[in-house]
C-alpha cells in the first residue's frame, strides 16, 4: 500500500511563531538586499534570459510559491529559484521566509540543501538554492513501492547526521517528512530542505508552537503539550524510516480524529519482510512517551544502523558551538565580525548596533543564546578554510569506521588541526 500522497502533501495545522527567547531579535522587514539574483525580479517565464541566468522550467510548487530551474549561461551552473509572492499582513509567512533564507545561508552540511542567495522586493521574495536534481524522496518511494533496507539505512544515517548537526546548534527542524528530503542525481545522497518552521530550542524554555505535517507529527504535538524540540524530529524521522521500508505511513485513517487517536496510541504493525533490527529501531523512535523515546545518538547505536559501514561515510561537520572553552573564547569575542553581523542584518534581524550589543552581553554573561548560535554559524560559513564539502566522499572501509561514527565526530580543535588552520 502506498502512502496517501494527497494527505501527506496537504495536511498542516496551526501557525508559526517566534519563541520567547528569540523575541529580543527584532525582525527588520524593510531590509533590502542588493545581490546578483536581483536580475530575476519581475521575471518568471521559461526561456527568459536575465543577466547571466536563464529560467528553464517549473520544478516544484508549494504553499508559498513556485520553484524554477535556472541555469547560469556563463558557467552552466544549475540552481533552484524559489519565488514567494508577498502577502500583506501575513507576519508568520514573513518570519518563515526570512528564517528559511538565513538558516540556508548559514548551515553547512552535505545533507542540507544550501541557500546561495536571497533578495526581497515589495512584491516577492526570491531564494536561490543549490539544485538537487533527483527529486523528492516521496516520488522516489512511490516509483518503487518501498526501499530495500540497505538503501533505507544509508538515507536514515545521512538524515541522522543532518539532524544531529542541527541539534548541536540548538536548531530543531519541526517539519521533517519525505517531501522535504531531496535526492541527488545518482540517488545516493539525500538533502534536507524547508527550514521555514525551524526554530531554536532550549531545555529551559520549551517550545509551544504546533506545526508540521500530521502524518509525521509526534503525539505530544497533537496533545498541545510544550516540548523541547529534538524529540519531535526523532519521531518524524522514525516515520520517514517506516515509510521508506514499508511503502506506507505507520498511522493512517480517512478520519482525522481517528488518525489522531492512532498516532497517540503508537500501535505499530510491520510487514513480515521487515527485519527485527529495523522494527526495533523504529519502535524506539516512535515511542509515544517523549521521555522514553530514543535520542538520535542512541538510535545510531542500534544494530540496524551499525550493520555495515556503507552509511557511516562522514564525520559530522564542525558545530557552531565549540566544545573546547579555549577555542570558543578565541572564536566568540569582541570585536565581532562585521561581515557576519551584516549577513544577519540583511536577513531580517536587528540593526548592527543592536546585534553587537546583544552579542557583547552574551559574551560578558558567558551565555549561549540563539543569536550566539547564529553568529558562530556565520563565522563558520564565511571561513573558506573551514567550509564543509557538499558532496559525499568515497565510501569508508570498516577500519576507517571510527572516523565517521556519529558519536566520534571531531570537535573544533581537531577539525582546525586536521585542516592545518591553527586558531
Curated annotation (Swiss-Prot):
Q: Phosphoserine modification sites?
A: 36, 38
Gene Ontology MF term list: ATP binding; protein serine kinase activity; protein serine/threonine kinase activity
Q: What are the TM regions of this chain, as residue ranges?
A: none
Q: Does the keyword Cytoplasm apply?
A: yes
Gene3D superfamilies in the record: Transferase(Phosphotransferase) domain 1
Q: What is its main location?
A: cytoplasm
Return the GO cellular component terms, semicolon-separated: cytoplasm; cytosol
User: Catalysed reaction per UniProt?
Assistant: L-seryl-[protein] + ATP = O-phospho-L-seryl-[protein] + ADP + H(+); L-threonyl-[protein] + ATP = O-phospho-L-threonyl-[protein] + ADP + H(+)
Protein kinase domain span: 53-305
Name the domain of life: Eukaryota
> Which residues are catalytic?
175 (proton acceptor)
Enumerate the subcellular locations listed in this protein's record, separating them with semicolons.
Answer: Cytoplasm
What the entry lists under InterPro entries is as follows: Kinase-like_dom_sf (IPR011009), Prot_kinase_dom (IPR000719), Protein_kinase_ATP_BS (IPR017441), Ser/Thr_kinase_AS (IPR008271)
Pfam families for this protein:
Pkinase (PF00069)
Q: Which GO terms describe its biological process?
A: signal transduction
In short, the EC number is 2.7.11.1
> Which segments does the entry list as coiled coil?
none
Which residues are noted in the entry as ATP-binding? Answer: 59-67, 82
Q: Which UniProt keywords apply?
A: ATP-binding, Cytoplasm, Kinase, Nucleotide-binding, Phosphoprotein, Serine/threonine-protein kinase, Transferase
* Family listed: Belongs to the protein kinase superfamily. Ser/Thr protein kinase family.
- The molecule here is called Serine/threonine-protein kinase ppk25
State the organism named in the record: Schizosaccharomyces pombe (strain 972 / ATCC 24843) (Fission yeast)
Amino acid at each position: 500500500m502506498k502512502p496517501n500522497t494527497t494527505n501527506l502533501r496537504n495536511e498542516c495545522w496551526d501557525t508559526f511563531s517566534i519563541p520567547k527567547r528569540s523575541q529580543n531579535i527584532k525582525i527588520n522587514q524593510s531590509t533590502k538586499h542588493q545581490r546578483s539574483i536581483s536580475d530575476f525580479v519581475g521575471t518568471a517565464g521559461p526561456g527568459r534570459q536575465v543577466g547571466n541566468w536563464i529560467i528553464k522550467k517549473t520544478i516544484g510548487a508549494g504553499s508559498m510559491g513556485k520553484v524554477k530551474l535556472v541555469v547560469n549561461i556563463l558557467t552552466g551552473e544549475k540552481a533552484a529559484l524559489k519565488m514567494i509572492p508577498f502577502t500583506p499582513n501575513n507576519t508568520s509567512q514573513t518570519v518563515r521566509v526570512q528564517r528559511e533564507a538565513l538558516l540556508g545561508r548559514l548551515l553547512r552540511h552535505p545533507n542540507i540543501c544550501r541557500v546561495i542567495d536571497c533578495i526581497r522586493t515589495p512584491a516577492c521574495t526570491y531564494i536561490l538554492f543549490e539544485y538537487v536534481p533527483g527529486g523528492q524522496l516521496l516520488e522516489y518511494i512511490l516509483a518503487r513501492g518501498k526501499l530495500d533496507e540497505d538503501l533505507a539505512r544509508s538515507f536514515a544515517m545521512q538524515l541522522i547526521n543532518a539532524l544531529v548537526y542541527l541539534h548541536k546548534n540548538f536548531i530543531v527542524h519541526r517539519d521533517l517528512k519525505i517531501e522535504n528530503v531531496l535526492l541527488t542525481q545518482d540517488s545516493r545522497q539525500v538533502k534536507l530542505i524547508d527550514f521555514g518552521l525551524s526554530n531554536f530550542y532550549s531545555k529551559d524554555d520549551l517550545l509551544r508552537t504546533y506545526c508540521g505535517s500530521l502524518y509525521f507529527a509526534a503525539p505530544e504535538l497533537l496533545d498541545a503539550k510544550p516540548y523541547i524540540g529534538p524529540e519531535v524530529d526523532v519521531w518524524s524521522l522514525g516515520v520517514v524510516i517506516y515509510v521508506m521500508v514499508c511503502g506506507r505511513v505507520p498511522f493512517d485513517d480517512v478520519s482525522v480524529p481517528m488518525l489522531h487517536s492512532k498516532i497517540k496510541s503508537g500501535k505499530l504493525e510491520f510487514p513480515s519482510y521487515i527485519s527485527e533490527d529495523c522494527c526495533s529501531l523504529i519502535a524506539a523512535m516512535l515511542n509515544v512517551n517523549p521521555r522514553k523515546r530514543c535520542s538520535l545518538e542512541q538510535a545510531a547505536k542500534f544494530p540496524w544502523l551499525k550493520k555495515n559501514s556503507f552509511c557511516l561515510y562522514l564525520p559530522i561537520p564542525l558545530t557552531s558551538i565549540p566544545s573546547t572553552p579555549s577555542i570558543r573564547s578565541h572564536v566568540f569575542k569582541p570585536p565581532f565580525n562585521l561581515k557576519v553581523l551584516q549577513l544577519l542584518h540583511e536577513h531580517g534581524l536587528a540593526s548592527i548596533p543592536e546585534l553587537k550589543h546583544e552579542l557583547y552581553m552574551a559574551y560578558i554573561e558567558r551565555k549561549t543564546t540563539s543569536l550566539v548560535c547564529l553568529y558562530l554559524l556565520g563565522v563558520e560559513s564565511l571561513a573558506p578554510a573551514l567550509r564543509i564539502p557538499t558532496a559525499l566522499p568515497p565510501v569508508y572501509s570498516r577500519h576507517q569506521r571510527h572516523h565517521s561514527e556519529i558519536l566520534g565526530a571531531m570537535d573544533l580543535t581537531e577539525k582546525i588541526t586536521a585542516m592545518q588552520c591553527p586558531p
